């Protein structure tokens, strides 16, 4: 508070970025083995701002039926064709992938929770990533309920299963501090595009420095 103040009173791209914001983004990226990370006020905002900038009417999004409400709402905001499969039903996921390809989808993204919060079930990421490779699809995982304690170093369900996914979203409001904040981690090109087009990022005040500093300390403890 004494060195960085109470709040930023601004969005990130005007005067809402301090060194510690970028430090946290880089630390999260390294922790999750991604190129870069973009911070949001909450993971609900992260999921709400993810799909619309990346997917257009020529693309397809395939979602697990029990995904978190924020994924469902984020998908509603984008123009991609929508497909759904029953919770963890890999046969139906493959059917939907085949249908999306048959319908001429340019890009296909599979969206899933890493851990389904109501039941505690883990997504079958080994099979999801296998099918994604088979049908040339991207994989997005919301890992709010796994980051910080699952996997060899607490990096979540992909680390737990030893697989790689294209995009991860998560929260600073559970194991990584327990207050507020969310993020998207992924390839540099994806994060660069989101910084220009993700509306919750562009039009929401930056995370308070105290939250950022506490999250950095939480990462220290986890690591």
Tell where the protein language model's regions lie, with residue ranges.
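Conserved PLP-anchoring active-site segment centered on the Schiff-base-forming lysine
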Residues: 50-69
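Short, structured coil segments at secondary-structure junctions
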Residues: 57, 77-79, 135, 164
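Conserved N-terminal alpha-helix of the aminotransferase class I/II PLP-enzyme fold
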Residues: 3-43
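Active-site C-terminal subdomain of aminotransferase-like
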Residues: 108, 135-138, 145, 150-223
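Hydrophobic beta-strand scaffold residues
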Residues: 8, 61, 82, 139-140
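Active-site phosphate-binding strand-loop segment of PLP-dependent enzymes
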Residues: 83, 87-141
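Short, small-residue-enriched loops and turns at beta-alpha junctions
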Residues: 14-17, 69, 90-91, 114-119, ...
